[in-house]
Amino acid sequence: MTRALAGVLVAIALLAGCGGNSVTQPAGSTKVTMTEFKFDPSDITVPHGKVVFFLVNSGNTQHDLAIRDSSNNRLSVSELVSSGDSVVFTVDKIDAGTYTIYCTQQGHEASGMKGKLTVT
Protein backbone atom coordinates (compact mmCIF):
# COMPACT_ATOMS: atom_id res chain seq x y z
CA MET A 1 0.00 0.00 0.00
CA THR A 2 2.84 2.41 0.81
CA ARG A 3 4.45 1.68 -2.53
CA ALA A 4 1.19 2.47 -4.38
CA LEU A 5 0.81 5.74 -2.45
CA ALA A 6 4.39 6.71 -3.31
CA GLY A 7 3.66 6.05 -6.99
CA VAL A 8 0.57 8.25 -6.88
CA LEU A 9 2.51 11.07 -5.20
CA VAL A 10 5.26 10.88 -7.82
CA ALA A 11 2.66 11.01 -10.61
CA ILE A 12 1.00 14.07 -9.04
CA ALA A 13 4.36 15.82 -8.70
CA LEU A 14 5.20 15.13 -12.35
CA LEU A 15 1.84 16.42 -13.55
CA ALA A 16 2.19 19.58 -11.47
CA GLY A 17 5.48 20.28 -13.22
CA CYS A 18 3.78 20.12 -16.63
CA GLY A 19 1.89 23.37 -16.11
CA GLY A 20 2.32 26.35 -18.43
CA ASN A 21 4.06 29.64 -17.86
CA SER A 22 0.94 31.32 -16.51
CA VAL A 23 1.32 34.22 -14.13
CA THR A 24 -1.09 36.46 -12.25
CA GLN A 25 -2.09 39.79 -13.79
CA PRO A 26 -0.25 42.64 -12.05
CA ALA A 27 -2.30 45.56 -10.72
CA GLY A 28 -2.39 48.45 -13.18
CA SER A 29 -1.42 46.32 -16.18
CA THR A 30 -3.26 46.22 -19.51
CA LYS A 31 -4.61 42.76 -20.35
CA VAL A 32 -4.34 41.69 -23.99
CA THR A 33 -5.69 38.30 -25.10
CA MET A 34 -4.06 36.75 -28.18
CA THR A 35 -5.77 34.24 -30.48
CA GLU A 36 -5.64 33.33 -34.17
CA PHE A 37 -5.30 35.98 -35.53
CA LYS A 38 -6.21 38.93 -33.38
CA PHE A 39 -5.56 40.89 -30.21
CA ASP A 40 -8.40 41.63 -27.80
CA PRO A 41 -8.60 44.53 -27.40
CA SER A 42 -7.02 45.59 -30.68
CA ASP A 43 -7.30 49.31 -29.90
CA ILE A 44 -5.45 50.13 -26.66
CA THR A 45 -4.91 53.48 -24.92
CA VAL A 46 -2.32 53.86 -22.15
CA PRO A 47 -0.53 56.79 -20.46
CA HIS A 48 3.03 57.61 -21.55
CA GLY A 49 6.01 56.33 -19.57
CA LYS A 50 6.30 52.79 -18.27
CA VAL A 51 3.63 50.46 -19.67
CA VAL A 52 2.91 46.95 -18.40
CA PHE A 53 0.98 44.48 -20.54
CA PHE A 54 -0.46 41.20 -19.30
CA LEU A 55 -0.46 38.93 -22.35
CA VAL A 56 -2.73 35.87 -22.38
CA ASN A 57 -2.46 33.40 -25.26
CA SER A 58 -5.85 31.76 -25.75
CA GLY A 59 -4.89 30.57 -29.22
CA ASN A 60 -3.49 27.30 -30.50
CA THR A 61 -0.03 28.53 -31.54
CA GLN A 62 2.69 30.82 -30.18
CA HIS A 63 2.14 34.57 -30.33
CA ASP A 64 3.95 37.72 -29.24
CA LEU A 65 3.22 41.43 -29.15
CA ALA A 66 5.51 43.91 -30.88
CA ILE A 67 5.25 47.70 -30.98
CA ARG A 68 6.14 49.63 -34.14
CA ASP A 69 6.25 53.42 -34.59
CA SER A 70 4.99 55.44 -37.57
CA SER A 71 8.46 55.21 -39.21
CA ASN A 72 8.16 51.40 -39.19
CA ASN A 73 10.79 51.00 -36.42
CA ARG A 74 10.21 48.14 -33.97
CA LEU A 75 10.40 49.66 -30.48
CA SER A 76 9.86 46.57 -28.37
CA VAL A 77 8.70 42.97 -28.60
CA SER A 78 7.52 40.54 -25.95
CA GLU A 79 8.76 37.00 -25.55
CA LEU A 80 6.88 34.30 -27.42
CA VAL A 81 3.86 33.14 -25.45
CA SER A 82 2.89 29.49 -25.85
CA SER A 83 -0.72 28.38 -26.18
CA GLY A 84 -2.46 28.54 -22.80
CA ASP A 85 0.29 30.61 -21.18
CA SER A 86 0.47 34.20 -20.01
CA VAL A 87 3.36 36.61 -19.47
CA VAL A 88 4.01 40.11 -18.22
CA PHE A 89 5.53 42.38 -20.89
CA THR A 90 6.97 45.68 -19.65
CA VAL A 91 7.96 48.61 -21.85
CA ASP A 92 10.09 50.85 -19.64
CA LYS A 93 9.44 54.10 -21.51
CA ILE A 94 7.15 54.96 -24.38
CA ASP A 95 6.40 58.49 -25.56
CA ALA A 96 2.97 59.87 -26.39
CA GLY A 97 1.89 58.98 -29.92
CA THR A 98 0.16 56.36 -32.03
CA TYR A 99 1.81 52.99 -32.60
CA THR A 100 1.01 49.70 -34.31
CA ILE A 101 0.90 46.49 -32.29
CA TYR A 102 1.37 43.23 -34.16
CA CYS A 103 2.45 39.61 -33.86
CA THR A 104 5.89 38.92 -35.38
CA GLN A 105 5.19 35.27 -36.15
CA GLN A 106 5.26 34.54 -39.88
CA GLY A 107 1.95 35.41 -41.54
CA HIS A 108 0.18 36.51 -38.36
CA GLU A 109 0.16 40.27 -39.01
CA ALA A 110 -0.89 39.70 -42.64
CA SER A 111 -3.75 37.54 -41.30
CA GLY A 112 -5.02 40.46 -39.22
CA MET A 113 -3.12 40.10 -35.96
CA LYS A 114 -2.45 43.80 -35.48
CA GLY A 115 -3.95 46.79 -33.77
CA LYS A 116 -3.40 50.32 -32.54
CA LEU A 117 -1.66 51.52 -29.38
CA THR A 118 -2.41 55.13 -28.44
CA VAL A 119 -0.10 56.57 -25.80
CA THR A 120 -1.40 59.77 -24.15
Question: Where are the language model's segments positioned?
Answer:
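C-terminal motif of bacterial Sec signal peptides marking the signal peptidase cleavage site
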Residues: 14-17
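Surface-exposed loop/edge segments in extracytoplasmic proteins
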Residues: 72-78
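Bacterial N-terminal signal peptides that target proteins for export
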Residues: 1-8
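N-terminal edge beta-strand
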Residues: 25-48
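Beta-strand cores of secreted/periplasmic/IMS beta-sandwich domains, seen most often
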Residues: 42-61, 87-95, 99-100
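Beta-strand signatures of extracellular beta-sandwich domains
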Residues: 64-68
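A mature extracytoplasmic/lumenal domain signature
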Residues: 36, 45, 57-59, 69-71, ...
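Extracellular/periplasmic metallocenter environments
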Residues: 19-21, 82-120
